[in-house]
């Protein structure tokens, strides 16, 4: 290999010289760190799907005498977090140590408190004993700013249940502070940060959990746990599970069957009457819901379970829960389709059934916020299908009368007329191209679909069909909307999309007394 030399004396390769190309970070077979150097918060490269990806260590643990690490892959969804062994770690690349976060505000407050103490000691106003039982207000606080003991600022309420900086609480406090109204977690990072189970066997399905669920700690030592798909009871060994199954006689959820068609059934269960079963359901669902942590206080909720029937019995496909008395008008608290039944259309059936119940109650409803990412996608798809079908068929009276006779009956009983009422309500004119068809109000759409006006306007805006033209709102049925409608109708005709039949619902809205709604602790 011939090498030349330039005028400055630096060796330069000739044109026929081979040049080695490497990464900025030189890789070698020599280990740059050991297992003992790995701490919580550090970042390293981990083998995932045949390639090395940057991951953060969230926790380490001794499992059956071997050290395992819980990692979060950078720029990937949290549900891909997993426990790994040391043989999947690339020890030839440098370990990235965690950065220590310094809160500047705390430093400033600490500095001010020190200076104030010094000034007080010089003036002789402070003794040796600490008498600061009430915190002094910050000098930088503007007049009128509420203190800890002042009334709550209603404009700054965290209505979505999201965690704010400085509001972190421990896992024990989180469990103690579970809400008696709703099902939101109050602390995402501590409770659901580390997944504690590796594999779940539910009936004939092997499912990999996504998130943490507070199952008994002895089960977390097992490679897999077994769950009965009828009682939802959990076991750490196959022998225990098989022995239980030989004695188990339950073939369906322990509630009232309120709906059945050729494909699915729905069961209503009172959380107060079936505490054990509902708690087992919440434990199972918490494995796949990141932002919910309700698993113990089931008394304030009704559970609606969707099942499919086989020769063995009715198997749980998914469920949703709702508060017996919701101050916010929610018709769904938690909603979940089990992963082994996802991408089969069951999620939309659950959503459709929740609105079917709202229709019987003569109420509008909306799911409790915030929704999970998959839940939000399912709701948006359902809202889109519902509004596209309604608006297109409303623009074509023949299709509307043919496919929605029950909606016409409901609209007639509620408004005494299908035509929009005069002035005073927000209305929109439906147009198809340049041909105006009919008027419809947002309130009427809400009355027909049982969706809230907020969800309706959100969906219309997302579809980009709500316009303002010549002093009035119009809904433009575009070619894209017509294509969506044709695709939807084709799915229904080809029986690729299952629709629930309201006439097969046998249900009366439950009524509860004040004593029944009083939560016993």
Curated annotation (Swiss-Prot):
N6-acetyllysine sites (modified residues): 292
Top-rank taxon, per record: Eukaryota
Motif (ESA1-RPD3 motif): 275-296
Location of this chain's protein in the cell: Nucleus; Chromosome
InterPro entries to which the protein is assigned, alphabetical: Acyl_CoA_acyltransferase, Chromo-like_dom_sf, Chromo/chromo_shadow_dom, HAT_MYST-type, MYST_HAT, Tudor-knot, WH-like_DNA-bd_sf, Zf-MYST
Chain ranges of zinc fingers (C2HC MYST-type): 225-250
Occurrences of domain Tudor-knot (ranges): 39-90
Single GO BP term: DNA repair
PANTHER family per UniProt: HISTONE ACETYLTRANSFERASE (PTHR10615), HISTONE ACETYLTRANSFERASE ESA1 (PTHR10615:SF218)
Family, similarity comment: Belongs to the MYST (SAS/MOZ) family.
Record remark on domains: The ESA1-RPD3 motif is common to ESA1 and RPD3 and is required for ESA1 histone acetyl-transferase (HAT) activity and RPD3 histone deacetylase (HDAC) activity.
Protein known as: Histone acetyltransferase ESA1
Organism: Debaryomyces hansenii (strain ATCC 36239 / CBS 767 / BCRC 21394 / JCM 1990 / NBRC 0083 / IGC 2968)
Taxonomic lineage: Eukaryota, Fungi, Dikarya, Ascomycota, Saccharomycotina
Gene giving rise to this polypeptide: ESA1
């Amino acid at each position: 290999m011939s090498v030349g030399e330039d005028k400055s004396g630096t060796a330069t390769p000739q044109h026929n010289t081979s040049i080695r190309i490497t990464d900025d970070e030189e890789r070698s077979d020599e280990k740059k760190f050991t297992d003992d150097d790995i701490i919580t918060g550090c970042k390293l490269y981990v083998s995932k799907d045949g390639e090395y990806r940057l991951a953060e260590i969230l926790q380490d643990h001794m499992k059956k005498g071997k050290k395992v690490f819980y990692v979060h892959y950078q720029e990937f969804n949290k549900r891909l977090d997993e426990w790994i062994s040391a043989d999947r770690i690339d020890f030839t690349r440098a370990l990235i140590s965690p950065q220590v976060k310094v809160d500047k505000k705390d430093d400033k407050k600490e500095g001010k408190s020190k200076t104030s103490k010094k000034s007080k000691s010089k003036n002789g106003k402070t003794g040796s004993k600490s008498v600061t039982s009430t915190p002094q207000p910050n000098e930088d606080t503007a007049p009128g700013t509420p203190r800890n003991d002042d009334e709550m600022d209603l404009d700054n309420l965290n209505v979505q249940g999201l965690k704010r900086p400085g509001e972190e609480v421990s896992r024990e406090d989180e469990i103690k502070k579970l809400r008696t109204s709703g099902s939101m977690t109050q602390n995402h990072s501590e409770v659901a940060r580390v997944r504690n189970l590796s594999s779940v066997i539910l009936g004939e399905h092997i499912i990999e959990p996504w998130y943490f669920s507070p199952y008994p700690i002895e089960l977390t030592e097992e490679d897999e746990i077994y769950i009965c798909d009828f009682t939802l009871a959990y076991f750490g060994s196959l022998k225990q599970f098989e022995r239980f199954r030989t004695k188990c006689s339950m073939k369906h959820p322990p509630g009232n069957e309120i709906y059945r068609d050729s494909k699915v059934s729905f069961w209503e269960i009172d959380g107060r009457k079936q505490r054990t079963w509902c708690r087992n359901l919440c434990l199972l669902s918490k494995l796949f819901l990141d932002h919910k942590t309700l698993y113990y206080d089931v008394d304030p909720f009704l559970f609606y379970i969707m099942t499919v029937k086989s020769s063995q019995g009715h198997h749980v496909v998914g469920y949703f829960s709702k508060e017996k008395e919701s101050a916010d008008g929610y018709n769904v608290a938690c909603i979940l389709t089990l992963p082994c039944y996802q991408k089969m259309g069951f999620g939309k059936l659950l959503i459709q059934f929740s609105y079917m119940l709202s229709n019987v109650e003569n109420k509008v409803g909306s799911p409790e916020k915030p929704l999970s990412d998959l839940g939000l996608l399912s709701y948006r798809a359902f809202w889109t299908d519902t509004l596209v079908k309604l608006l297109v068929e409303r623009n074509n009276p023949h299709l509307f009368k043919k496919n929605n006779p029950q909606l016409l009956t409901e609209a007639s009983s509620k408004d005494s007329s299908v035509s929009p009422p005069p002035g005073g309500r927000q209305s929109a004119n439906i147009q198809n191209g340049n041909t105006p068809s009919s008027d419809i109000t947002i309130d009427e759409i809400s009355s027909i679909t049982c969706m809230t006006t907020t969800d309706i306007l959100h969906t219309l805006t997302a579809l980009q069909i709500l316009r303002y033209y010549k002093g009035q709102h119009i809904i433009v049925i575009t070619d894209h909307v017509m294509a969506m409608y044709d695709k939807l109708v084709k799915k229904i005709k080809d029986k690729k999309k299952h629709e629930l039949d309201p006439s097969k619902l046998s249900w009366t809205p439950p009524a509860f007394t004040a004593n029944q709604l009083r939560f016993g602790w």
